[in-house]
Amino acid sequence: MISSRYSLPVIFLLILALLPTIIHSYLGSEYDDGRSVQTIPTTLAGFSSEPYLRHKDQWVKSLYGSEDWIERIYKNDNGEKIRLFAARSYDYKKLYHHPELGLSHGSNLKEEGIVMLPGDPEIPVFVLRSSSGSGIDAYVLLHEGKFIKDPVSHQIKDAFTQLFQTRKAMTLFYVSDTTAPIADNFKKTSSASILTTAIQSFNANETTGVEN
């Protein structure tokens, strides 16, 4: 039998242990903030687009845990073609853990590092270059209105908070240009322009959150 002097601390610890279950089972485990990548315009930075039909809903859901996604080829009058993929998921690791392995399979990409694009705040972009001599891929991660520079560290720091709050979607913005010269400064590429304007248009959406 528990001594009366320990009863209150024990009750407190039991309530604390049950809180995550209560939150996720009864109040909903996911928070829909009302945003969608579907609102990203089909024309960006002077490029018009058409759907990229290679990847299907089930493939994207399986690989990236997303049911809200787009994939388009943006073209301009000079013949440039930029592929944009954007997706939202509550499974953060599926988005941040080498997204290029699925989206640019077989391209033999090497990580170049993080490039900061101008903005308020600046946008950290993970840049990858093809070892073939041409081709640039790049992606940005966004969570709760903040850009993620170190996704692993971010998830570790966020792990405790997630026990007591409903999960909020992370957004991946991914661009690929298979013909960009290897020596191009990423900041001056069309890929950077497409990426920046896609993010700006997404962030401009008003939100009305709902717990699921």
Question: What name fits each language-model region?
Answer:
Residues 26-46:
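Alpha-helical transmembrane signal-anchor/signal-peptide segments
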Residues 41, 48-50, 175:
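Hydrophobic/aromatic-rich, well-ordered segments within soluble, folded domains that form packed cores
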